[in-house]
Amino acid sequence: MSDFVPHDLIPDLWDEILRRHWMFLETEESIEKLEERKQLEGCLKEFLCVVQHDRKFFLPETGHVLRRSVLELPDFSAQNAIVAFETISQYANNLFTKPWRKEYRTLKTYSGCFQHDIQSRLLDAEQLFLAMGYRRAAEDTFVLEGPICPDQVTNVSRDAMAAYVECQIMKHIYAGVTAAGYVCTWKDILQFRERYVGGTSTTIKEMVRQLSEKRVRMEQPPMQENTYSNVVSAAPTACGMRSNNVAHHPSSSGTCALHPNGLNEAGKYLPPYPAPPPQQPHLPGPLMTHSRSLDHYQEPQAHLPHRHSFDQQLQQQCQLPHVYEAPYDCLDGLSMGSSASYAAVTGAYNAPGNRYPLPYNISSQLNAPYASPADFYGNGQHTNMYATLGKTGPAHSCDLHRRQPNTSAAAAAALAAMQHRQSTYPPDHHLIDFDERAHLTQHDFGTHDYDPQYAELRGQVQPSMRGNPVAMYATYGGYDLPTTLPQAPPPTGQDMYIYARPVPKSSRMRALAEAGGINSTDKHPRSAEKQSTMDNNRKMHKELKERNSRTAPAKRSGTERDIPTTISDLNSYDSASLDGFVALDSSSSPPLMPKVQEGVGSFESWNYVFKNLERSGYTKDLGDREDLLVQSLDLGSLSITNGGAAPPAEKRREATNPTNGEKARTLDKKSGTGRREAKVVQAPAPSPLPNSSSAGVKKVKSALKTAVVDNRGTGSRQRTGAVPKQPPNVSPQLIVTSPNEWSCSFCTFLNPDTKRICEMCCRSKDFNLEAASAASSSAAAAAASAASVSHASSTCV
């Protein structure tokens, strides 16, 4: 199982290991066996200190288990690995010395010994058992079939002991390095042992030396480097604004670029490079300095008569020969390591026609190396990446006039810089456009005052309501809209781009064209910024449009068709369909509250339900009204009629006054419990009239499939005056039960029609609770109840 040839490397030591291992296995349990084990461990330790790491173990599985356990096991320690390898070695020794024991031929991985001593301390330890000759019979069972192979078992036993000794060596190294005052991990020790060959003391000395050098390198300051210049800057000592006898930067024209009086003859003709602040002498100078000339980009030409370089002083007349003859600008002001400025051209720096114009507001996008907006020379206390146009002017490069920043000022400056960068470009044309979820502010609901689409509605609104968007929406379209509109809190600077997502330019142009903002073929999309800032409804996101289409009332067509709201198919009987339902435009009505979407709510969201109830024969004077929130079936107002032409009042009279063979039974629901009473009217089977047609029969059958929800409310309802034709009322028996089931009169359990005994209470199908109570009082009442039972049984089927 291995190409390891130990005799070619150290024949004598390897022979000694093999001989002592055989003696250890054949020795009985005694003091002598302990001595043999100590001698064997000594030979293994000497062998592991003189061979390379890939030759330490005879089986490659042993090295794999040790390496993976050290690298991947979270709580690995050498002591835990010692216990695990010792257990594996002992198991192999028992299998070799006592192969007749049946318990050694079956290994259960869920046993306590395997779980606590092996599985939790090593990874892939099963590979060593497979190397012994076991095979996996199940997920948690290993079985050894047939006679054992002595060579395989002894190889695993010897390799497990070698790994046991290797873990002891790692443990000693860890203790030695820790005692020297350094911190190392088991992974560091294993990797060092894999690269270097040596004993315990040699490894400790070498690791301590490397850790010491690493600590020294970390304590040293980083090397000063300037990516854009070969000039190393030193810290200035003072500002030369008020005196000329102070020290100046050896390679600059002055310590403060804004104070021209601090010039000396030695540094007058050198290229001007800004100096870092003196409180950080060990840090490198700024890499991307801000051009002070760009701060005055829009000033008149007379203010900047001789500004040839970004950091050049006004009095500096002598210039070195320039490199390029084109009016280009070097944005970093450092000339890329050259001593001549790329922008050293004739004429004033900002003179018209002397240079190509920079992009829109690019001066606000340049910045010092990641400092605050008012700090152009790198303050380590600020981490703002974007610049802004400060009203106080650019700061000095010296620390003499710099105000000490505090924590609140730094936070406010960072916030202002972020907001200013976003406002630098037009609102719809940032450097990277985003598919943002726009916040709805209060001004969004006043768009109708500025949008032409609301011009035609202004004549319909009362003069007192003009200018009041809430009052206008309350009567818009003839509906009673809620008078309370959602008021979103004003968004802050941090909330403006929380849900931003980059979108391609083609999608942005198409979205703007669909919204009516710009033309898709427009070459200058920046003209869109001239549009009104209060047309946010035109760019409302997709979720708001869907909410409006679901909750807001529909635009009425010329015929004013009603929408049926029944449980069954809408086309089951002759009624109005959804063909006339026009989707509501997103900008014609304000969004309703989210609670209205969930079915609890306003009159306008349920108006189509009330319209359908009117078509079904519902009137105001049908009786006491129930709670609006109690939405259930009004079984008392449902009945089956043959003709379907009687007025609603007559139907109600017929339902409340049963005659001849009609009987009525009332469900036991007391009024004291707060629940409404529901009556089930049972009519005899309809018989066809002489003048009835097949179409009328089909209407009755289709009406039986429809259940109308009676949602009565306490508020006033508008009536159209005309009552459309209505479907016949439905019997509650057809709603509650199916044709193949019957409801028990005692426990209301639904039983299959094939059984006549209730499966829940063992009552008969013909059992009647009222009849049973009446039978105990009098015989006459029993006879009457029996007749009622016989009548009720015919309708439960």
Curated annotation (Swiss-Prot):
Matching CDD domains? PUB
Listed GO biological process terms: protein transport; regulation of protein import into nucleus
Main subcellular location: cytoplasm
Q: Cite the InterPro entries for this sequence.
A: PUB-like_dom_sf, SPATA2_PUB-like, Znf_RanBP2, Znf_RanBP2_sf
Gene Ontology MF, one: zinc ion binding
* Residues in PUB domain copies: 79-146
- Compartmental location: Cytoplasm
**Region entry Disordered, spans:** 515-570, 638-697
| Positions of RanBP2-type zinc fingers | 735-766
- Quote the cellular component terms of the Gene Ontology held in the record: cytoplasm
Keyword tRNA-binding among record annotations: no
The family database entries (Pfam families) matched by this protein are listed as:
SPATA2_PUB-like
- Give me the segments passing through the membrane: none
Q: Which PROSITE patterns match?
A: ZF_RANBP2_1 (PS01358)
> Is Cytoplasm one of the keywords UniProt gives this record?
yes
Which UniProt keywords are present, listed alphabetically? Answer: Cytoplasm, Developmental protein, Metal-binding, Protein transport, Transport, Zinc, Zinc-finger
Composition-biased stretches, type Basic and acidic residues, lie in 662-679
What does the further note read? 'Tamozhennic' means 'customs officer' in Russian.
Q: PANTHER family from the entry?
A: PROTEIN TAMOZHENNIC, SPERMATOGENESIS-ASSOCIATED PROTEIN 2/TAMOZHENNIC
Q: How does it assemble?
A: Homomultimer. Binds to dl and msl-1 via their nuclear localization signal (NLS). Also binds to Ran, Ran-like and mbo.
Q: What does this protein do?
A: Has an essential role during oogenesis and embryogenesis, perhaps in modulating the levels of nuclear import of additional proteins. Modulates the nuclear import of dorsal (dl), Dif and male specific lethal 1 (msl-1). Negatively regulates nuclear import of dl and controls the accumulation of dl in the nucleus after immune challenge.
Q: What is this protein called?
A: Protein tamozhennic
